[in-house]
C-alpha cells in the first residue's frame, strides 16, 4: 500500500505547504482547464519526485481574466492572496492560509499544450491535471541549470533520466549539456529538500545521467 506524501515529508511546515498547494490546485481547475503545471512541484507530484518544492508554476493564456475570480474563491475559503504583480508575461502572487504560504506564478505569454497527467495529492489520492512530459521538463531544466546552476534543477534531470524513457533528441541535448556542466552553487542544500533516501552528490548525478543516456 502506497504511503501518502503527507506521511513522508520531514517537516510539519512542508506538510502544511503541500496541503495548501493542493487547495490552490483545486481552485484553479474549478475556474479553467487550460492551466499547465510545470516546475519542481510538477515533477514532485506528477513524476514521483523525492524533492520537496514550495512554488506552483503554470502556463495559461486565460489566467489574467480570472485573477479576481481566483481571489474571490480563495477568500471564501479563508485564503489571502497578496503581492500580486504582472510583469506583462508572468502574474505572480502569494497565497496564505494563516499557517503557511505558497508562491503562485502564471506565465500567460507562452501558450503550452499540456499532457494529461496524474497529480498526487498530499493525502495520496491522484487527480488528473495538465502538465509537461518528462522530455519537456528535462529541456526546461537544462536551460534552468545552465542559467543559474541550482542543484535542484540538476537533481530533477537526474531523477527523470533514471525513471523514464527519454527521447533520442533529449539524450543528444543532455550529452551536450554534460560536456560543459559545472558544479552547482548551492550543492549542500539538496540534503534538506530530498525527503527520501540519500541526497546524491554532484558527481553521482552526472555519472548516473551519463550512464542512462549512453
Predicted regions and their residues:
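Structured mid-to-C-terminal alpha-helical surface segments
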Residues: 1-35, 46-56, 61-214
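Glycine-rich beta-strand-to-loop/alpha-helix junction loops that act as flexible
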Residues: 37-42
Amino acid at each position: 500500500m502506497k504511503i501518502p506524501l503527507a506521511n513522508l515529508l520531514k517537516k510539519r511546515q512542508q506538510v502544511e505547504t503541500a496541503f495548501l498547494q493542493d487547495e490552490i490546485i483545486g481552485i484553479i481547475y474549478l475556474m479553467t482547464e487550460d492551466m499547465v503545471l510545470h516546475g519542481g512541484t510538477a515533477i514532485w507530484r506528477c513524476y514521483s519526485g523525492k524533492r520537496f518544492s514550495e512554488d506552483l508554476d503554470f502556463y495559461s493564456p486565460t489566467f489574467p481574466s480570472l485573477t479576481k475570480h481566483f481571489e474571490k474563491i480563495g477568500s471564501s475559503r479563508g485564503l489571502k492572496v497578496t503581492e500580486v504583480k504582472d510583469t506583462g508575461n508572468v502574474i505572480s502572487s502569494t497565497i496564505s492560509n494563516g499557517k503557511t504560504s505558497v508562491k503562485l506564478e502564471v506565465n500567460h505569454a507562452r501558450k503550452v499544450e499540456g499532457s494529461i497527467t496524474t497529480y498526487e495529492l498530499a493525502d495520496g489520492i491522484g487527480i488528473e491535471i495538465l502538465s509537461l512530459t518528462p522530455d519537456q521538463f528535462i529541456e526546461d531544466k537544462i536551460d534552468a541549470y545552465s542559467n543559474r546552476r541550482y542543484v535542484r534543477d540538476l537533481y530533477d534531470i537526474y531523477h527523470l533520466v533514471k525513471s523514464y524513457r527519454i527521447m533520442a533528441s533529449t539524450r543528444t541535448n543532455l550529452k551536450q549539456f554534460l560536456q560543459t556542466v559545472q558544479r552547482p552553487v548551492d550543492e549542500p542544500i539538496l540534503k534538506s529538500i530530498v525527503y527520501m533516501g540519500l541526497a546524491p552528490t554532484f558527481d553521482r548525478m552526472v555519472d548516473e545521467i551519463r550512464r542512462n543516456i549512453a
